[in-house]
């Protein structure tokens, strides 16, 4: 029992000791937690105080470390433009000064000494510095002390905006990294531009499809054979190129019956030409459907033909082209041999026969008609002799532009006749013009003459009349000269024998003429 009690006691003592130790340890832990809480608060307060002290007293290295971080602390000037704004440069210059204030010239000198880029470039960066100082609210103007005689003022940073310059970080451009990380675009997303050859083919196909869907009637097989025979004499490769260039806009429905007579004038094929016709596939046969219909017209898309786009789709097409009157020779054009005919504002239905005759009558040895160069129309000049076109239009019964007119319309064509005797130079033409004007403004000579040869002189006609008594006029003149007022005249003093009836002097002749008039 004693042993057990001893054991119990022995076992009990350690329990008490353990409990006492645990209580002591818990009290120590609580004390350490309180100390740690107090130390964390003290650390926060000390850090805040240090920050405020650092704002007031900062060295150059600490300013670079706070403003730009590690990048600016190890900054090496390479002569390139620094990757920061002008406001940041101004704040950096002011914070590195001794009194945290600088003049405008001091800011300039610090930027030049720190960055070589601004030392070599004296351009518009100084204006940018002045604009930032005057417009940015973070900078304040401070007057200089009264003791100093220097003019001007200092610039400092507003304490409310000081944190903006402390927490700022350098933002470098990552253009090189972004360009290197760009993935190459896949080929499926690439857009291939349409070639110049594919664009007109798509337009032609869409136009033919819309035409086939719009037409409801089909022409007879004889009309198809008659239309195909017009181009039977041409090679097969030319036929394929012409068929792809067919333009077929429909005419108004009111012209269906009236234009049926014009379709009958199409020349019929011969038996020999029908045997040489090329075979037409099923796909191509759809292109030849309704080709000879009166509502359609066929014009080869040549370089020397152009449709006038001034009319709507419902109106009939108008063709403006120039044909050569004699197309049998393929020699260059000469003005002495041929004449140009300007055919404008003709209905295409009226010119279809002209085009077909022109195609059928072409010389097979000459170059193809669709490759022939267009005939240039010579510029107008005052030396060309034009024949006036027919201005009077006899047909006035058509109310609408697309209505069919039974009467024949006068041709507006004008034949250009080139003058063969044009002047060689402008100087010669000007000389001829001046001579012509002088001949119109010619004034006959009005000088007096007594021989009666000048018919325009009235004095000569007066003296030549038989009723005029010249002897009596001379005697009266002698009596007049004997008057006392003419005694001292030079003529009387010169001749002592008195006044003689000698021929008059030229001066006296003028006086007589005036007196007679």
UniProtKB/Swiss-Prot annotation:
PROSITE patterns given in the database record: FORK_HEAD_2 (PS00658), FORK_HEAD_3 (PS50039)
Gene Ontology CC terms, in alphabetical order: chromatin; nucleus
Compositionally skewed regions (Low complexity) per UniProt: 209-223, 254-270
Main localization of the protein described in the UniProt heading: nucleus
Annotation: DNA-binding region: 81-172
GO biological process, alphabetically ordered: cell cycle switching, mitotic to meiotic cell cycle; meiotic cell cycle; positive regulation of transcription by RNA polymerase II; regulation of cell cycle switching, mitotic to meiotic cell cycle; regulation of transcription by RNA polymerase II
Function in brief: Functions as a meiosis-specific transcription factor. Binds to the 5'-GTAAAYA-3' consensus sequence of the promoter of the spo6 gene.
Protein name as it appears in the record: Meiosis-specific transcription factor mei4
């Amino acid at each position: 029992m004693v042993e057990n009690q001893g054991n119990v006691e022995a076992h009990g003592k350690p329990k008490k000791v353990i409990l006492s130790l645990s209580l002591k340890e818990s009290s120590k832990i609580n004390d350490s937690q309180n100390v740690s809480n107090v130390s964390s608060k003290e650390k926060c307060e000390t850090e805040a105080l240090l920050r405020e002290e650092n704002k007031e007293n900062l060295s150059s290295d600490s300013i670079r470390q706070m403003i730009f971080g590690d990048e600016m602390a190890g900054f090496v000037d390479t002569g390139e433009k620094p990757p920061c704004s002008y406001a940041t440069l101004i704040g950096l210059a002011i914070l590195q000064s001794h009194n945290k204030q600088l003049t405008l010239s001091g800011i300039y000198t610090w930027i030049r000494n720190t960055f070589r880029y601004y030392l070599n470039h004296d351009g518009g960066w100084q204006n940018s510095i002045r604009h930032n100082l005057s417009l940015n609210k973070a900078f304040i103007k401070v007057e200089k002390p009264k003791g100093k005689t220097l003019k001007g003022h200092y610039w400092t940073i507003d304490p409310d905006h000081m944190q903006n310059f402390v927490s700022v970080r350098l933002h470098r451009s990552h253009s090189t990294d972004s360009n290197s990380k760009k993935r190459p675009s896949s080929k499926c997303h690439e857009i291939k531009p349409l070639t110049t050859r594919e664009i007109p083919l798509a337009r032609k196909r869409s136009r033919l499809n819309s035409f086939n869907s719009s037409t409801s009637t089909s022409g007879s097989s004889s009309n198809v054979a008659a239309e195909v025979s017009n181009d039977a004499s041409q090679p097969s490769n030319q036929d394929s190129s012409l068929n792809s260039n067919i333009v077929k806009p429909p005419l108004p429905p009111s012209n269906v019956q009236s234009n049926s007579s014009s379709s009958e004038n199409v020349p019929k094929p011969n038996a020999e030409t029908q045997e040489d016709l090329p075979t037409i596939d099923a796909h191509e046969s759809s292109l030849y459907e309704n080709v000879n219909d009166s509502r359609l017209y066929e014009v080869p898309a040549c370089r020397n033909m152009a449709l006038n786009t001034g009319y709507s789709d419902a109106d009939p097409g108008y063709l403006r082209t120039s044909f050569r009157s004699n197309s049998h020779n393929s020699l260059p054009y000469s003005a002495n041999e041929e004449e140009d005919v300007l055919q404008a504002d003709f209905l295409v239905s009226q010119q279809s026969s002209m085009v077909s005759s022109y195609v059928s009558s072409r010389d097979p040895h000459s170059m193809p008609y669709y490759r022939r160069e267009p005939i240039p129309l010579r510029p107008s000049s005052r030396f060309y002799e034009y024949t006036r076109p027919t201005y009077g239009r006899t047909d006035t019964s058509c109310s609408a532009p697309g209505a069919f007119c039974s009467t024949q319309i006068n041709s507006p064509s004008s034949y250009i006749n080139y003058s063969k005797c044009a002047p060689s130079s402008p100087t010669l033409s000007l000389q001829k013009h001046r001579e012509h004007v002088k001949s119109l403004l010619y004034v006959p000579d009005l000088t007096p003459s007594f021989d009666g040869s000048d018919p325009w002189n009235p004095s000569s006609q007066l003296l030549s009349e038989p009723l005029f008594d010249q002897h009596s006029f001379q005697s009266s003149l002698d009596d007049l000269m004997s008057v006392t007022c003419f005694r001292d005249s030079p003529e009387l003093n010169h001749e002592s024998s008195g006044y003689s009836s000698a021929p008059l002097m030229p001066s006296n002749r003028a006086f007589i003429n005036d007196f007679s008039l």
